């Protein structure tokens, strides 16, 4: 079966499961297997004949059978899922916001793992859209998830994949957050309106604001921030001026300007978090050690909290 057909089949299974749950009121379902709350589970899947894996975490709750929102976390290159989770504190955020957390591992070995986000034209690359759809189906066989509140968050290569998911699995996600990652190719004109938060440093040396630089390998391509924002503003119907907010804590060499187009009047909330003099880094309140030559890290905001707050207010209409 061609990749596109397999992907449509997996997405169709998601739709059938969603419809079945709507018949139960769309809110509750008994957990299919024994799953302990507050525990992280490692899961292995075979997708396209490849061994793939992810972990998922269910925060403690006094209503374990209730359907809950699902947050997909896509790690950057050189920082696999568990390492990245510890770095940005996603399990603590899942506890706070009540998200089921699922974090897939990219293809590769050791730390050298990445996702196929459309940056390289290689027919032998894995289909990570199919992997994502298969992973969601697998999670749905274990616990009750709220199909109207499936979110994706990623950094760098993982952030690029969140954009790709809006293209390859349209209508699946209720919102995305991409930090230091723009799409590998321009967004399609028929892309569905989707709440999006883009976070990018103006002096990012790895994925520059203006797109690939002379230091970017020739076989890698990705979009610049300005054109990506313009595309999302068109898709999401952002015609009014943005609401602006400045964040500036002294001592970190950066400032943050948050550009926000609320919905309504836009079709979907759209946010650009512009990190002035910021590098290829995840903003935090306390500086953290990271790879060299990645630029300044902003300590003006807690990006994990800001991203989860943005996602938690998004919900898509399910087709009945």
Sequence positions of predicted segments:
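Short beta-strand/loop motif that positions the catalytic acidic residue
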Residues: 198-200
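Short substrate-entry loop that stabilizes the transition state in hydrolases
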Residues: 63-111, 185-186, 206
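C-terminal catalytic histidine-bearing segment of alpha/beta-hydrolase fold enzymes
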Residues: 223-224, 233-320
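Alpha/beta-hydrolase active-site loop
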Residues: 121-142
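Cap/lid segment of the alpha/beta-hydrolase catalytic domain
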Residues: 105-127
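Alpha/beta-hydrolase fold nucleophile elbow
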Residues: 145-155
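A domain-start/cap signature at the N-terminus of enzymes
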Residues: 2-4, 10-70, 82, 96, ...
């Amino acid at each position: 079966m061609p990749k596109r057909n397999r992907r449509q089949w997996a997405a169709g299974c998601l739709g059938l499961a969603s419809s079945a749950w709507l018949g139960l009121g769309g809110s509750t379902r008994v957990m299919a297997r024994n799953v302990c709350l507050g525990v992280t589970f490692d899961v292995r899947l075979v997708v396209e004949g490849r061994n793939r894996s992810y972990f998922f975490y269910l925060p403690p709750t006094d209503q374990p059978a209730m359907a809950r929102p699902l947050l997909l976390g896509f790690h950057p290159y050189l920082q696999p899922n568990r390492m990245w989770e510890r770095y940005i504190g996603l399990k603590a955020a899942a506890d706070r916001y009540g998200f089921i957390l699922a974090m897939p591992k990219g293809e590769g070995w050791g730390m050298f793992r990445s996702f196929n986000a459309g940056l390289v034209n290689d027919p032998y690359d894995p289909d990570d859209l199919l992997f994502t759809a298969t992973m969601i189906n697998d999670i749905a066989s274990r616990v009750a998830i709220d199909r109207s509140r499936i979110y994706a968050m990623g950094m760098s290569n993982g952030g690029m994949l969140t954009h790709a998911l809006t293209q390859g699995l349209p209508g699946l996600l209720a919102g995305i957050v991409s930090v230091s990652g723009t799409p590998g190719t321009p967004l399609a004109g028929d892309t569905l309106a989707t709440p999006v938060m883009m976070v990018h440093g103006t002096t990012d040396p790895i994925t520059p604001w203006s797109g690939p630089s002379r230091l970017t390998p020739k076989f890698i391509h990705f979009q610049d921030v300005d054109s990506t924002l313009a595309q999302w503003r068109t898709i999401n119907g952002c015609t009014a001026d943005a609401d602006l907010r400045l964040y500036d804590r002294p001592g970190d060499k950066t400032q943050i300007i948050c550009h926000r187009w609320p919905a309504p009047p836009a079709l979907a909330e759209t946010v650009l978090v512009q990190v002035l003099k910021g590098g290829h880094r995840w903003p935090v309140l306390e500086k953290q050690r990271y790879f060299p030559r990645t630029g300044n890290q902003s300590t003006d905001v807690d990006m994990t909290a800001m991203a989860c707050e943005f996602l938690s207010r998004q919900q898509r209409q399910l087709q009945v």
